[in-house]
């Protein structure tokens, strides 16, 4: 086990289909529990972009880079987890086949690309177009740019909350929210230097200050403040929308710095400011069972220490584990009798 006196490194993660992804300093691990109760693990080295390009690690810039990275990584990990789950894939549509042939790309890459484009369009539609239309309506009534900006910002927050509530009504999404809770509990366990076990992890809350849900809320609030000073007097709805889009990387960059600052501070002011983000997570996390925590623990250990030695593999190359204990750093798989001969 790791040295209990060492300060734990920051590690983040994401809930996926029937599992959890964890991202360590230089690797990503995804653990998925299949219907037969076994767990399969995908492990990839992942060097931060800031190591290759120092400027990407600069304050503000790193936040904008992180936003793009979150979107891309989120889609790719969900796609990987779907494959790892072992469920039958849907037959590609004629359009997907045609597009793959025209672009010279695999159908999987085309489907993922289309999904990413749709996700971006949905986000822009919900959180930029609709609020801009609300602002346009307020301006047409003779309200000031300041009032219109405040109404637009409030609309964004309400849409975000409504979207999360709606998602929580879907049974499969609720289960994913449980894995989200498992991710947070495991991260807390790691941060407190406790042995990673379901029993230890269960004692922690599902609400974590560095969660992406809190980041989204901070983005909304920072954008409201920024747009009170930039572009508030623009009456043309299309131009206001364009200005908001162009400033999105700046908003994301500032929001990232605020999130990190609040998460690592124990001052009374920081606790008060991060409270709304923690409460919003009640919509995107649920209490996990021990099996879900096992998946999160495996991903945590593998992301930090690598795959177990001599782990059996699937045909696709994923490691097969039956217990979270098999992922502990010093664990060595026992040899079978026939292997000893």
Give the label of every model feature segment.
Residues 2-10, 15-16, 50-57, 96-112, ...:
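Cytosolic juxtamembrane amphipathic/interface segments immediately preceding
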Residues 80-84, 119-144, 219-243, 252, ...:
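Juxtamembrane "helix exit" motif at the C-terminal ends of alpha-helical transmembrane segments
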Residues 88-138, 144-170:
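Hydrophobic alpha-helical segments characteristic of transmembrane helices
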Residues 58-80, 151-177, 248-264:
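Hydrophobic alpha-helical membrane-embedded segments
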Residues 107-125, 204-229:
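Transmembrane alpha-helical segments and their cytosolic interface motifs
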Residues 31-32, 42, 66, 70-101, ...:
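Short, charged cytosolic
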Residues 2-12, 16, 20-22, 138, ...:
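Polar-ligand-bearing catalytic/cofactor-coordination segments
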Residues 1-86:
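Divalent-cation
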């Amino acid at each position: 086990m790791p040295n209990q006196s060492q300060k734990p490194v920051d590690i983040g993660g994401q809930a996926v289909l029937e599992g959890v992804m964890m991202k360590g300093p230089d690797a990503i691990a995804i653990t998925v529990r299949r219907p037969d109760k076994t767990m399969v693990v995908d492990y990839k080295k992942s060097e931060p972009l800031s190591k290759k390009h120092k400027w990407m690690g600069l304050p503000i810039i790193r936040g904008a880079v992180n936003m793009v990275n979150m979107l891309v990584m989120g889609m790719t990990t969900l796609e990987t987890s779907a494959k790892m789950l072992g469920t039958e894939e849907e037959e590609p549509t004629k359009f997907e086949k045609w597009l793959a042939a025209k672009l010279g790309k695999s159908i999987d890459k085309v489907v993922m690309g289309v999904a990413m484009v749709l996700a971006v369009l949905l986000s822009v539609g919900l959180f930029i177009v609709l609020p801009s239309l609300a602002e346009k309506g307020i301006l047409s009534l003779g309200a000031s740019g300041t009032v219109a900006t405040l109404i637009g910002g409030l609309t964004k927050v309400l849409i975000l909350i409504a979207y999360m509530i709606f998602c929580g009504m879907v049974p499969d999404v609720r289960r994913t929210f449980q894995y989200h809770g498992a991710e947070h509990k495991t991260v807390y366990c790691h941060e407190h230097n406790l042995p990673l076990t379901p029993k230890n992890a269960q004692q922690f809350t599902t609400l974590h200050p560095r969660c992406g849900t809190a980041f989204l809320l901070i983005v909304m609030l920072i954008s409201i403040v920024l747009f009170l000073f930039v572009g508030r007097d623009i009456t043309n709805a299309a131009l206001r929308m364009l200005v908001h889009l162009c400033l999105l990387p700046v908003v994301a960059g500032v929001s990232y710095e605020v999130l990190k600052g609040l998460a690592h501070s124990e001052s009374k002011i920081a606790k008060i400011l991060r409270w709304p983000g923690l409460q919003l997570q009640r919509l995107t996390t649920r209490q996990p069972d021990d099996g879900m925590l096992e998946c999160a623990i495996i991903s945590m250990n593998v992301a930090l220490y690598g795959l177990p030695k001599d782990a059996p593999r699937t045909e696709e190359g994923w490691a097969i584990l039956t217990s979270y204990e098999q992922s502990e750093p010093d664990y060595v798989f026992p040899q079978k009798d026939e292997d000893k001969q």
